[in-house]
Amino acid sequence: MDLFNYSRRESSEVNIGATPLGGNNPIRIQSMTNTVTMDTEACVEQAKRIIDAGGEYVRLTTQGVREAENLKNINIGLRSQGYDTPLVADVHFNPKVADVAAQYAEKVRINPGNYVDPGRTFQKLEYTDEEYAQEIEKIRARFIPFLNICKENHTAIRIGVNHGSLSDRIMSHYGDTPEGMVESCMEFLRICVAEHFNDVVISIKASNTVVMVRTVRLLVKEMEKEGMAFPLHLGVTEAGDGEDGRIKSALGIGALLADGLGDTIRVSLSEAPENEIPVARKLVDYILTREGHPFIPGKEAPQFNYLSPGRRKTKAVRNIGGDNLPVVIAERLEGSFETNPQFKPDYIYCGGSVPQSRDNNIAYLVDANAWNPEDKNVYPAFNYQQMIELHHTVSDLKFLFLPYMAMNDEVIAALKLHPEVVIIAQSNHPNRLGEYRAMTHELMNEGLENPVVFFQYYQETKAEDLQIKAAADMGALIFDGLCDGIFLYNQGPLSHIVVDTTAFGILQAGRIRTSKTEYISCPGCGRTLYDLESTIARIKTATSHLKGLKIGIMGCIVNGPGEMADADYGYVGAGRGKISLYKKKECIEKNIPEDQAVEKLIELIKANGDYTEK
């Protein structure tokens, strides 16, 4: 794979009804209903809304044989109204349900974590090599008849691994690792290959964006080793709602799309399913603007490990680089210097003049020709044509605005002499990611340890568009371990506070700097038997000030306890109008009436000393 130049991965084509996937087909957009699958009319109407918004596949939960059989009626209801969009059955725990669903849906999703293996209990299991081989044989014995049903009905399948529902067998053998998630998928893929079943799509998802990106990268590598090219379905599970859900999804999915990986995507938002479609479309369309871009002559650094990157080694300059958290630089070239106390930038770039009234908790950047060494907490910012001035200026911190194409021998020599320089990387290239990677890899190849802050310029009028584009542009840089800071500049009507909040949201979604409460919330489906959206809103109202706390809000137990493995507290649907509360992986209280559960959650947080008053 070329780190610096965009091209889509070559994948095999899969026939899914009238809408094929992979190969030379466009990147497909999809969503999932959250209606009760036995309510045919509700499912048909919601599916129509998803399709009318641009959805190309519609998935429905099929928790039992009754639901699987009702897919026939839903399919008829849609086809009778002129819709030929493929339906996808989502199956967990019961392979018999998959057998039935394959007769009525164009694609069936199965979960390797609970297809044959029993549901996850977080118990350590011991196997001899012979016993482990017998477990694989059990999968073969049950899976092959299902593949035969799919062949007879021309039904495609998705092998959908979720971080939250890995089996105890895989967890015991591989641990909670990307390798375990990949092997969980490969066990099933090898059977498909042996049985000459090719209409297979694969996904590996997690709510943790770092885990999700690294695991998909590893999966592609392992498939290449075994001569497989199955198409990829991308998604970040339990991404949440609003700004958080959009940023988290765009960061994780965008990082992979930017490397040419992915044939279909689903943006999982805790909102109405049709709201997911325009977000997904904007993300795909933005990434595809890179197609056919001018060549970037980057050279990969030998110490870089794409599959498991560590943070690039840098020398700390003040509070930037080294072991410091990534910084946020904001611009205030015009308008108010107002900031949100919760999302206060570390540095403000103010162009050619420093404001008279300054915040003592913020440092300032000013153009080098306007810098006064007497100004406290103000630092000079040079452009690449001011190298002589940079040499002669005395300051313990200097900033250098630097495009990749300006990295000549003079600049490299200057950086070697001036470790106090922090680079603000700039790019006007259609593939900014490629140029930014090329720059940081050149720094590594030259043995330079200057920190790098990535400058991202936009002209957006809507907050959602800024969130999607900025997160997509920063994703791979964060997951590659290259980010010492982020500098978002939006020329348009969006307030400075919106831009600042987006920058902090991106760093939190990438798990490299925490600035607020984190919510791991699912989008809901037919298994969710309580009002998810209003519940999330009430929990956020009560807990949004608890910086650093992670709260899982899950519709059901399919991924609940697993995806909440690193959450501090969990709120999980346990039946109609009933909720179970978790502390870490431990269920503390079961079957709480829904109207009491949010208050009980707050009581649990308080009882453990993790609650502070607003």
UniProtKB/Swiss-Prot annotation:
Cofactor(s) named in the record: [4Fe-4S] cluster
Record pathway: Isoprenoid biosynthesis; isopentenyl diphosphate biosynthesis via DXP pathway; isopentenyl diphosphate from 1-deoxy-D-xylulose 5-phosphate: step 5/6
EC numbers, comma separated: 1.17.7.3
The protein's enzyme class: oxidoreductase
Record note on cofactor: Binds 1 [4Fe-4S] cluster.
Binding residue positions for [4Fe-4S] cluster: C522, C525, C556, E563
GO molecular function terms noted in the UniProt entry: 4 iron, 4 sulfur cluster binding; 4-hydroxy-3-methylbut-2-en-1-yl diphosphate synthase activity (ferredoxin); 4-hydroxy-3-methylbut-2-enyl-diphosphate synthase activity (flavodoxin); iron ion binding
Catalysis performed (reactions): (2E)-4-hydroxy-3-methylbut-2-enyl diphosphate + oxidized [flavodoxin] + H2O + 2 H(+) = 2-C-methyl-D-erythritol 2,4-cyclic diphosphate + reduced [flavodoxin]
One Pfam family, short name: GcpE
InterPro entries: Dihydropteroate_synth-like_sf, IspG_atypical, IspG_bac-typ, NO2/SO3_Rdtase_4Fe4S_sf
Keywords: 4Fe-4S, Iron, Iron-sulfur, Isoprene biosynthesis, Metal-binding, Oxidoreductase
Single GO BP term: terpenoid biosynthetic process
HAMAP family per the UniProt record, alphabetical: IspG
NCBIfam families xref list: ispG_gcpE (TIGR00612), PRK02048.1 (NF002534)
Family indicated by similarity: Belongs to the IspG family.
Function: Converts 2C-methyl-D-erythritol 2,4-cyclodiphosphate (ME-2,4cPP) into 1-hydroxy-2-methyl-2-(E)-butenyl 4-diphosphate.
Name under which the protein is recorded: 4-hydroxy-3-methylbut-2-en-1-yl diphosphate synthase (flavodoxin)
Source organism: Phocaeicola vulgatus (strain ATCC 8482 / DSM 1447 / JCM 5826 / CCUG 4940 / NBRC 14291 / NCTC 11154) (Bacteroides vulgatus)
Gene: ispG
